[in-house]
């Protein structure tokens, strides 16, 4: 009997070999994406200790981190002559609370034992707020590396914005800003098979990334507010991350492109065929991610020379070495063995067990890949409803996301026909809104069996 399978180890290997980051969902926020993207594009990070001491008033439990007490902060400001005489401790404390909200300093992190130069993410818009790598930020580093490689003009523009540091938040913190940059040169995508030998789906995705990024850059240059520009850019990165995850099966297994059907019906799925179809498009993305990971686990089983005989004789896998296999895992593994006995090839057997390993990981760990897509999508305003009570989502865009999509599709002073608009939305984002036979065919070619007609899609496009 072979070595017992460690599910957590297999997951890390699949993410490292094929994905480029670990799409964990538990507490990921848009600010984590922003921090990773900006660090990667700028090519460095800063020591932000003084910013943290000033702005991090309390952690998620209301505790005051060591070194961040009001008396300590006030004394330091007075000693360095960075506040005027007559400003009270109460006034400083009020300003610090405003600063924490401005930065969105992550109150989900417990830092009461000491201020370390990690585990805090900022939404501010300059090089002085770039921090070293921390949890959940590898997603941003990944998409930042893609943009730097495949849309370098946009990356250079964002880097220049960060370098100027002339936004209101940077000016507010100017008395405590530090300049001690450390180099960051990681590119997470370069060693992935999908980018070493790209297939047509990868080339299509990267072409859309480049074209939409250049168009967005042209529009950002017309906008006077640096922070708004960076906010729109972060929404762009989040949407591209969602698309990337949904396309992994197409990148590695040659499957169909999964379309993003936007719902502008304004009605519930029970009342609108477009809303139902958008919900189905989201469900298809979930299933596509599931199948990709099942394939990935099967590939790893093959690398480790697991044959049909070895898998049929194997013990139930454990999530990690510290945990024993539960009754639920025993049952799932036994069912996999029953299915595998009917398979005729080792590859078929490994895929059966790969599917089961994915199900086991979903059962054992809350932070599995589809949660990452769902949480990022809802928090950024790309998916609706935003609450946890409705697991079935559909693509109903917030005004911010819609603005980003439009600014990435239509250049300044450009006028597009409806046909050109539909074509660009598909080529740049894989988006379908409706209004043509072409789009209906795209939905049908993706494998969606829908009770939806051209008239419903046309009304959806009119609402758009």
Spans of features found by a protein language model:
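Long, mid-chain structured domain cores
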Residues: 80-254
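Short amphipathic alpha-helical interaction segments
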Residues: 430-445
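Charged, amphipathic alpha-helical stretches
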Residues: 1-109
